[in-house]
Amino acid sequence: MEWEWSYVFFSAIIILPAFILFFSQKNTTKSSYKFPPGPPGLPIFGNMFELGTEPYKKMAVLRQKYGPVLWLKLGSTYTMVVQTAQASEELFKNHDISFANRVIPDVNQAHSYYQGSLAIAPYGPFWRFQRRICTIEMFVHKKISETEPVRRKCVDNMLKWIEKEANSAEKGSGIEVTRFVFLASFNMLGNLILSKDLADLESEEASEFFIAMKRINEWSGIANVSDIFPFLKKFDLQSLRKKMARDMGKAVEIMSMFLKEREEERKKGTEKGKDFLDVLLEFQGTGKDEPAKLSEHEIKIFVLEMFLAGTETTSSSVEWALTELLRHPEAMAKVKTEISQAIEPNRKFEDSDIENLPYMQAVLKESLRLHPPLPFLIPRETIQDTKFMGYDVPKDTQVLVNAWAIGRDPECWDDPMSFKPERFLGSKIDVKGQHYGLIPFGAGRRMCVGLPLGHRMMHFALGSLLREFEWELPDGVSPKSINMDGSMGVTARKRDSLKVIPKKA
């Protein structure tokens, strides 16, 4: 969240009188509250310039001084940050509903995206309906098991693409594996939702959709001055809403084409089989606690969000896990040995192998502990004035859960900064939101609804990569010289993408 000074100072000069009036009124209103502790910050700007490019790390450092709950003022936005497993448990167990609303970023005003979004929808009946239909139609165990052939096809293609890229690469140089994991995840969702490959560069419409979705992810991950000074929204100083409107518009336009194609297929009776798009098109509800029918706009946004949520998290998580294994050759040797002993020669990695690979499961848990795909869970917002751990949290306060700091909480984890998959062997700790020191996908009512499918795909992709290839670092790169800095966006990817040399096992 590194802010560009020119935007902020220009904004302040234009509306300084409004700032003064606004803050004087706000401070008078809130002077009686007992807020959590936090650094004092600058007039007007608050703490926004103290956080750097990896704010989750800076906030974790502040935990040592201010404790498990941190209070910040980011421009005109009051923010509470939850930073320990104890505070996380208190929030999700005892205050989940009070903190169940979402902050709506300004870029998500484009094409009224927020109105059909499951991730940032207000807590209420429509959100509950969305979550219910996703769970029943895509993410229950039976449905996920039925999608194994789709995952198999997409991962097989990924392995072919990697081998082809490696064969054409200059000797001693590496390739970016995460790009191929992203493509495989994108195609998996394309097949489950729309019954087509969407990372197919031979298809013009698929290629355009893929590019538009990549750009939407990019604009969503840039810190926006309009979100910390909401009364600047109409100026769109960074042109982020304009860019989002352009690329969201392109994605929506292509989705309209997909819907039209599906309508024609249904009329002709040439459908390949029922997918999630059919479920949405055929839905008929009561009109009470759920819509009687989904509008075309709601269907488009519903589908777009599935792609946005399900691709970056999988590819970044696999990249971090492979990075940690390359940094720790002894762990790489252990997981490779486990896989070779569990799977007979000349057989591909399969879904059913995952349960027989406890060390590989531990590797992914440990990597997710150290590198959660969203270092801050999607920001929450208080529905009402709330007492939390003895502090006052006013209605409409932004609430950040620092999953990165919680995964490194020394009161929860022994030697928290070290990569030790062995800590999970024989342990019942998992990432499903019941162990509050390990919440890479959230917890409570608003935890990631797609976790069951995404979690399966992470294991399947990583296991297949380890089964099919031996992995080496490029010339001049040693395990300890790998840059472990993250980049702050929709997800916390490696700042420098991992480059590796795959050799057919």
Swiss-Prot record:
GO terms for molecular function: heme binding; iron ion binding; monooxygenase activity; oxidoreductase activity, acting on paired donors, with incorporation or reduction of molecular oxygen. Transmembrane segments: none annotated. Its EC number is 1.14.-.-. Its cofactor is heme. It comes from the Eukaryota. Keywords: Heme, Iron, Metal-binding, Monooxygenase, Oxidoreductase. PROSITE patterns: CYTOCHROME_P450 (PS00086). InterPro entries: Cyt_P450, Cyt_P450_CS, Cyt_P450_E_grp-I, Cyt_P450_sf. Heme binds at residue 448. Belongs to the cytochrome P450 family. This is Cytochrome P450 76A2. It comes from Solanum melongena (Eggplant).
